[in-house]
Amino acid sequence: MQHFKVVDNQAYIGGTHNTRPVMMAFSFFDHTTKVLPGLYANHIEISSIEVDPARREVHVLVHTQKRGCQFSVRSYSYDAKPLRTLDFGGEDHNLISGKLLTVNDDELMLIGNYSTDCTPYSQGIYVTRIAHGETGPADADRIQYVEFSALQNFFKYLKPKQQQKMQAKLDKLKQENRDTKFRYRLLVHDPILTEEGLLLVAEVYYPQYRGTAMPNAVNLPRVGPAAVDRYFDTFRYTHAIVCGFDRQGNLLWDNCLPIQDLDSAELTEMVQVSQQDDKLVMAYPHKGEIKTEVIQKNRTVRETETFSLKVGTNDKQKITDSENENLLAWYGHYFLACGFQKIVDDPRQGFNPREVFYVNKLTYSLTEKPTDDKAGRSGK
């Protein structure tokens, strides 16, 4: 299961079966299940599902890897009947992912990342407005594209000298009228409605693979000096970008959160954002700690800070390992942190760690300087 949404008494569940996408509607009332038609096919990926409680509609955003890498918004009724399809296709830009956000009674905004070569590697982000009930081929002229190189703070995750070299490279390419496109994998979050328009957060990542050199064995063919078996290891996150748009889809500002040595076995949203007045608190879990940074549009108000997750009520207890760490921006200035920890009650009495599952309620208030005392405590 990869997608889950609820409207009234019905849940919409999306996943894959035999490498093909499947979307089902499950009724909590009579416990019946219906399959949404038109999705179980080869070369189709479900980008996201969005629900419209007011109209009792479900929008399934899909990406087709063939036929010009078409992207479409397929709308269904509450009882899983197809209503309409809005297609996005183009020779120069291929939409990879998309998120919908209702801006008023008549319009939605579609935002996500795009590529220029029909691959998972994106060259930037896009935003467009669509009308409720719009169908058929979408108007490509309404889509606004923003290349990564056009973002002022996209490369802020690099060290100062590396940033200078990157900027010099960009300036040289522009002077020579050469291509300034960059290719990154992007995990796009749900957009957030603001007074100005909308807020988009996305995390830049890449998959890591490990290679195992297998020595020659008896009766096995020799291919080169050794056979190498590459297998997936983890996803490595490098930085997160945050962009502010007005209600017409124009980029107003951008910022960047550097991410330090963060790996995850599953591709999930690690960076969480809490809105506090006109500032944003950006945070992510990292090896039993929480790292934060506070921004105000394109300015950094507080540099990276690190807070420890305390263990129980015994100060002698020590965390020896943390796994499956998750952080959630809850409400107001509160976060929730959970995961598994291995702790030692008193290292002086021997090393005998025990594993606990913890749920912490964390507070980050901009009205005062945060301290480690605000970190929550682990629950058993």
Walk through the language-model features, giving the residues of each.
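Entry beta-strands of beta-propeller and related beta-repeat scaffolds
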Residues: N9-I13, R55-V60, D106-L110, E196-L200, ...
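Structural signature of eukaryotic scaffold interfaces centered on beta-propeller domains
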Residues: M1-D8, S48-A54, K99-D105, F182-E196, ...
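Blade-level signature of beta-propeller repeat domains, shared across WD40, Kelch, NHL, RCC1
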Residues: L328-R377
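Short, conserved, GDST-rich strand-edge loop motifs in beta-rich repeat architectures
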Residues: H63, I111-I125, E203-R236, K342-P353
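Conserved blade-ending motifs and adjacent loop-strand segments that build the rim/top face
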Residues: L86-G98, R142-K161, K174-F182, N255-Q272, ...
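Long, internal scaffold/assembly segments composed of regular secondary structure
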Residues: P53-R56, G68-E196
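Loop/turn-rich, solvent-exposed surfaces of beta-rich toroidal or solenoidal domains
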Residues: V188-Y209, A213, V218-A227, Y231-H239, ...
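Beta-propeller blade signature
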Residues: M23-D30, Q70-K81, S122-T135, V223-G249, ...
